[in-house]
Amino acid sequence: MALLSVIRRWHFREHLSIREICRRTGLSRNTIRKYLRAGGAEPKFNVPERPSKLDPFADRLSAWLKTESKKSRKQKRTMKQLHSDLVSLGYEGSYNRVAAFAREWRDDRQRELQTTGRGTFVPLAFEPGEAFQFDWSEDWAIIGNERTKLQVAHTKLSYSRAFIVRAYLLQTHEMLFDAHNHAFRVFGGIPGRGIYDNMRTAIDKVGRGKERDVNVRFMAMASHYVFEPEFCNPASGWEKGQVEKNVQDARHRFFQPVPRFPSLEALNDWLEQRCKEFWAKTPHGQMRGTIADIWVEEVPALMPASRPFDGFVEYTKRVTPTCLVHLERNRYSVPASLANRPVSLRVYPDRVVVAAEGQIVCEHRRVIDRSHDRPGQTIYDWRHYLAVVQRKPGALRNGAPFVELPDVFRTLQQYLLKKPGGDREMVDILALVLQHDEQAVLSAVDMALRSGVPTKTHVLNLLHRLVDGKSLTPPTLDAPQALTLTNEPKANVERYDTLRKTEVRHAS
């Protein structure tokens, strides 16, 4: 192409003769004339089609490439493996020819995808109260001066586009149920359909087409709220594009820069408030008015929510001889009467409830620590061990559950343990909380300490007077006039001197 441009420039601009051009280029006159008549077109050469050794295997290789394109990156065969498989079938060509064929096949497939229906979508329209969309995302926040990775639940009404964002530490079933409880509370009702991707908190197994093995507890929640769950095709986020867009918007609105809060509860309260503020100032986009305006129109079409779903996840645990149950590397105490017995552990987002024989026996604040660099925590309730120390009062001195006794009990313990039998007496006083109100027992102990008589008998006396409603201060008596003393008696100790006289001895 460059030589053609030079020949044309010499002839048409510099007016050189064909003879001179032939001398400079070494080409024949006929070739020069042909180039000049060709105009600006590039010279073409007839290249005969040459058969390739890969031609008999082209269909098989195309089928292999199509199959491999549907596999994950780690499961795909390499070009060298495909070349080896072709060689085993009788292919005698080079690896480079196979690699070139694969490149051409990928280019053709890419062009086909760009010119077909894939990548084009149909706009969706929803009726009021028809559906909501749900999705998870990951973001960061500083909770209690520690940078924490959060699992953020996004719920969005498809008609009004009202949305709610709520943060959790884990992406588990109990968190999913809690997110729905709060979303329906904020929305003021329940739509008829829920649109999800194939998240592991809802789907146990993805089948062919629309077949799904839905989690039993998730279906229990959907049945409780009377909505129909609908799951998108795998890798088809555009089927719930509203909430996918909401994930991007929420990251810019709420998590950039990284928010800082003393607790997760404070963060969620702030997120709920900010979401409602965005409802009021964000235009709907397709209808006149803000998101808040359209949401007010949609609320009557939502089914009113009755009571929140009891969204716990239940495990069967065996209580250890030290009256503990284990969950997520942490340990929680249970009453000593359940030691070495199976119990039901109901896990909520913020608490752990222990049930036995159909009755709730205790409850603890849930501890979630995803750092494996720190050991698990043990959460005690000293009341659970009172039955043990009643049999073994000496365990009260160094018992780990009794480190967190109320300050009043700690002060009394320091006094009683200095006396013989103080262990038993202290245990008897602590055991009073099993039959009486704990606050009343604490008040009785506090009054006994302030009176300077911190004994079991005095504490019992004060406690019974508190329980019976009797006054703890002696009453003032208003005696009648007839009983008033006119002459108060005066002490005269000299009269005892008569007893000191010498005794007269009598003869026997």
UniProtKB/Swiss-Prot annotation:
Residues 124-299 form the Integrase catalytic domain. InterPro entries: HTH_IS21_transposase_type, Integrase_cat-core, IstA-like_C. It comes from the Bacteria. One of its GO terms (biological process) is DNA integration. Residues 3-65 form the HTH IS21-type domain. The keyword DNA-binding applies. GO terms for molecular function: DNA binding. Keywords: DNA recombination, DNA-binding, Transposable element, Transposition. NCBIfam families: transpos_IS21. Required for the transposition of the insertion element. Belongs to the transposase IS21/IS408/IS1162 family. This is Transposase.
